[in-house]
Amino acid sequence: MVDKIEKLLLCDCEGSQKVDSTALADATGLKCSKVYSELCIKNLDIVEKAIQSGDTAICCEQQSSIFDEIAGNIDKDSPIVFDIRDRAGWTVDKRTVVPKMAALTAEALMEKPIQKAKDVTSQGRCLIFGDCESVLEAAQILQETLSVTALLDPKDGDEILNVNGFDVVLGKIKNAKGSFGNFTIVFDNLQELVPSGRGPFKWTHAQDGATSSCDIILDLSKDDALFPASEKRDGYIRADVGQKTKFTSAILNASQLQGTFEKSLYIKYEASVCAHSRAEKPACSNCINVCPTGAILSSGETVTIDPGICAGCGACAAVCPSGAIEYEPGPISWILARLDVIQKYYKGAGGKNPFLLVHDDHGRELISFSARYGDGLPSNVIPMQLDAIATFGHAEALAAHASGFEEVFLLTGPKSDTDTILGEAEIANAIFENALRVVEVNDPLELSNIFEGLAKRANKTQLSKPMGSRRQVTRVASKTLNPEKEILPLPDHAPYGAVLLDNDSCTLCLSCVSLCPSGALGENPDLPQLRFQEDACLQCGLCSNICPENAISYEKRLNLSNAALEQTILKEEEPFACIECGSLFGVKSSVERIIDKLAGKHSMFSNSDATKLIQMCDDCRINAQYHSDNNPFAGGERPRVRTTEDYLSKRKDH
């Protein structure tokens, strides 16, 4: 918990919820105030004293703006506030909510990861394009605050009668890239206005491939958006001009985008463990495939992540098999810590049969509406809010079950990355039945119904507290949940499995060993062996792509036995003994195969001496070549030393 917090300021919101201050104090170990009824109205003096003390958290999040204003008036930091009313107190469930309130309190007072950010500067350069009339209307308004360029279709050039305060060009956008404060636009058929002369405006000759930059793009066209997941691209504002409210809102939003802003940084990337590519052969591209904004691109053996484009959905971190990508605002270690605290305080206060409900902002709104107008959440359903619910993958779901949660629900919304979430749920459910229940609820009054009618699970014989990387967490949790099983089949996109080797095709060239990004494939420096450690395999596909004999395939599975942690021999052969010194080298079958293909069949191996070179180790081969009649390192024959007699013998007068 936050060290400075020692007290809780409680309110029952005009008696609409039951708050037991004594029981809550016993469950949390914190001092609890008496239960007030109108902290935000009649008891503001109590709130001011609590803020002045600096050691009190207020159990009312709904009126946080009032509390922040009070803190500002007395020159104090804003107090810690959190909700126990909508998430716990307002419910038709007659069972005690003290364990749930204790868990929510303890979780709210945990130290949170630091949110990193960078400064983004916008000079207010705004490009507007789309319908001529709408573009000119928007440009006329925005030119008072921004540096505006209006892009019109070439056919609309004759409609320009007067231009004041902004630039007008004709053309078509070929492509665009970048993000807020740093967009780059490529135009075709670009024509600039010629300001001189009398009469109708004139335009320069059309130019293709012209490039320009801007800070803001206001898209008023009816064409496809310039960017994938365009609603997540900062600085790119798209509006339907047919809806006046949205059109006006877009103009207002664009007018505010000048100055210096903070852009959150979401992703931590460790290139050294990335399994994207090796030796120009493709391998894992999970993060590229799931990124909705196109922020992740291939860059040789690794990937590059553009922080300006990244919208922080977290899907890449969930599907990364090696842990090269981590979602910094909420890494798996933070989620596991929250699960542990919730369990500890919920069960410590006597709570039983806990359900976990993972949700985002949309889910929080549903919970609030359900609490006010419906049945609210049952007393054993503990909500946990995440900024990006796509980061809650199979490892987190399994860890929740292994730590004691009876059921785990993930509440999606209209902006959720459903494909990634369902893919992770498929893996989790293959390991443990219904480990992650993905639900979509549009009617808040129906929210409480999703927790009804579930068959009670058999009591877990043991619980665990998984820690470490996603792979380590998955293994520990899976062993806890499947104590009698060793091999669990998994779907095709799972990052766990075995390498299957066609022994007849494999020549033990070991090219797969040198390029395996996780070290799952290994060799024996003393003998021709191909070894494999299943627990380390990422199923990235690199070894299959690199194998010249197409001898490698995969089996998607999770091996929970200890054998998965050890190196097993996929193939081994007898080494070849040098015919000169007897030292072992190479693979006997390969050497014999080479001799069979070359001896007497190739000009360089037409005699037995040349063939013997293949059967020698490196040292003996060099020695034999050096002393051979056909030594490639030898110089030409040295000429005989000439004497006086040689010269005189050639004279005619001699």
Enumerate the predicted regions with their spans.
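Flanking helices and flexible, charged tails adjoining ferredoxin-like Fe-S electron-transfer domains
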Residues: 2-3, 272, 315-411, 549-654
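Terminal amphipathic helices with adjacent charged low-complexity linkers/tails
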Residues: 300-339, 409, 416-419, 423-426, ...
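A generic secondary-structure signal
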Residues: 111, 141, 344-345, 372, ...
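Short acidic loop-to-helix transition motifs that present clustered carboxylates
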Residues: 38-44, 303, 389-393, 530
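Basic (Lys/Arg-enriched) interaction patch that binds polyanionic ligands
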Residues: 290-323, 511, 515-518, 527-546
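Short secondary-structure boundary/capping segments
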Residues: 74, 233-235, 371-374, 423-427, ...
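Flexible gly/pro/ser-rich segments immediately N-terminal to CXXCH heme-c attachment motifs
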Residues: 302-313, 501-506, 529-539, 567-568, ...
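Ferredoxin-type iron-sulfur electron-transfer modules and their immediate structural context
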Residues: 1-290, 294, 353-366, 410, ...
